[in-house]
Design a protein with these regions (language model features):
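A generic structural motif
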Residues: 303-309
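Non-catalytic regulatory/interaction regions at protein termini and inter-domain linkers
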Residues: 2-154, 158, 163-167, 171-179, ...
Length: 474
């Protein structure tokens, strides 16, 4: 579930429903959100057999769009339903099996129904053994060409000139807000535990600020994170929508619910829709930031009223998200390269010192600052058979010796590291009073010889998002 206000706080907002809501949230984490069996009604959907190009499934709201019932369309050939069907069929055959991104086939005209002869945008992708076609109101292509594309081109130039990731984020939220008109646009990244921190924000004055706030990992279940990696953009135009079921409910070719992972119109969990309403958010859009194949963060857009996002705008925003992802990946790779170069410099210096003195201990003791900088540590210990040399800020010698014994009992493990000594070394409770994390490397296969680096505890104040006025059940 995309971030907003902390979901746990929402549960606490109503004591009468807290138990049922807790169960709802637990169920939400298990919900197969890729197969909702329905779509959002800002468009309608048809599923075609890949080979025969006949209709296998259709959304019930086709009656609202075309004044035709689903059973009037099932089994019909593409060419029966759409003008220039042969041309469209050729375009559909060119869809890649590997690229599941919805592709704008063109603006099409239906041969019958209430929209007969009117242009309707058709977006399609190949997945789950079928062709999934989505139809929506056409966008103004001229406006997109004259406005959106120059904006994107200029934005890409600005990204390339950014000095760091924070500047990239600030530029991106401003640009996405300018392109989409959403009331609030923010970017947050995920830490190692999956919690999110808002780095940048651009908002209208009547929207509350989330800048600097953190959100718990539980707000986005694992299956939702996987979908954010697979499908880079997600739009909910109106949280009060009534979902339109598919007819028939299951894909006739597989006998299973249709996988809508990549569909723009894919319906949303009812729990999440209530979650949005409790945040006074009616429309939302999420753009994935994927770095090295992992979900690094999200560009999250909110609006207090229903808001349409046309295909051209979605395409521009997805491109912005992909460019931002590449730029962040490049910044991270550059920082990693610089760090490795610095490490190699430290290693050369330490090896030279050890060679000059013909001793590991004496060589490292001769370069205490370099030895500590190698691991960005505040203290270190050099352990040999007869010596325990301490550098910088370290635990007392007796606790270091106890740590060495504990390490020695871990047979066959040459490397140990932790960022939480109290959690990971409960056998030595006194140790956590002096250090928060450590790195230990065995340098002998026969003896208890170690290089150990220590880091102090780093206290961090986390500002979690406040709770809304209404509970999920309200």
């Amino acid at each position: 579930m995309p971030f907003g206000l902390e979901l746990k706080e929402i549960i606490l907002a109503s004591s009468e429903t807290s138990t049922s809501l807790s169960n709802a949230i637990a169920n939400c984490a298990k919900e197969p959100i890729h197969i909702p069996g329905s779509i959002q009604p800002q468009g309608f959907l048809m599923v075609f057999d890949e080979q025969a190009l006949t209709v296998l499934q259709v959304s019930e709201n086709v009656a609202d769009w075309l004044a035709l019932q689903p059973d009037q369309l099932l089994g019909r050939h593409l060419d029966e339903l759409l003008e220039d069907g042969a041309v469209l069929a050729e375009r559909l055959t060119q869809l890649s099996d590997e690229d599941t991104t919805p592709f704008h086939i063109g603006d099409v005209r239906f041969r019958e129904g209430s929209r007969r002869g009117e242009l309707t945008a058709m977006v399609a992708h190949r997945f789950d053994q079928v062709l999934i076609a989505e139809f929506e109101t056409i966008s103004n292509t001229i406006t997109a060409y004259n406005t959106l594309y120059p904006m994107v081109r200029t934005f890409i130039g600005h990204l390339q000139g950014a000095n760091d990731i924070d500047e990239l984020c600030r530029l991106s939220v401003a640009e996405v807000k300018r392109v989409t008109g959403f009331g609030r646009v923010k970017i947050y990244s995920f830490d190692a535990d999956g919690n999110g921190l808002v780095h940048a924000e651009c908002r209208d004055d009547d929207y509350p600020s989330y800048l600097g706030l953190s959100f718990p990992a539980s707000d986005i279940p694992p299956q939702a994170r996987q979908l954010y990696v697979a499908n880079r953009i997600r739009v909910i135009e109106d949280a009060n929508y009534r979902p339109s079921p598919l007819q028939p409910a299951c894909n006739p070719l597989t006998g299973k619910p249709l996988d809508l992972s990549y569909a723009t119109l894919r319906s949303v969990s009812p729990v999440h829709l209530q979650y949005m309403r409790n945040m006074q958010t009616i429309a939302s859009m999420s753009i994935s930031i994927v770095v090295e194949g992992q979900l690094w963060g999200l560009i999250s857009c909110h609006h207090a009223s229903a808001r349409s996002v046309g295909f051209q705008t979605r395409t521009a925003c997805e491109l912005l998200g992909r460019m931002l992802s590449l730029q962040i990946e490049a910044k991270i790779a550059h920082a990693r390269t610089q760090h490795l170069l610095q490490l190699r410099k430290h290693i050369v210096q330490m090896l030279s010192a050890m060679a000059d003195r013909d001793s590991v201990s004496e060589g490292l003791l001769a370069l205490p600052d370099t030895f500590l900088a190698f691991a960005q540590a505040s203290g270190a210990a050099i352990i040999s058979a007869s010596r325990c040399d301490l550098i910088g800020q370290t635990p007392p010698r007796d606790q270091v010796n106890a740590l060495v014994q504990w390490l020695g009992a871990r047979h066959g493990e040459d490397l140990f590291h932790t960022d939480n000594v109290g959690r990971d070394i409960p056998e030595l409770p006194e140790l956590s009073a002096h250090v928060g994390g450590l790195l230990a490397v065995a340098i002998s296969e026969l003896h208890s010889h170690y290089l150990i680096w220590f880091k102090p505890e780093q206290k961090r104040v986390v500002q979690w998002a406040g709770k809304p006025d209404k509970s999920v059940g309200s």
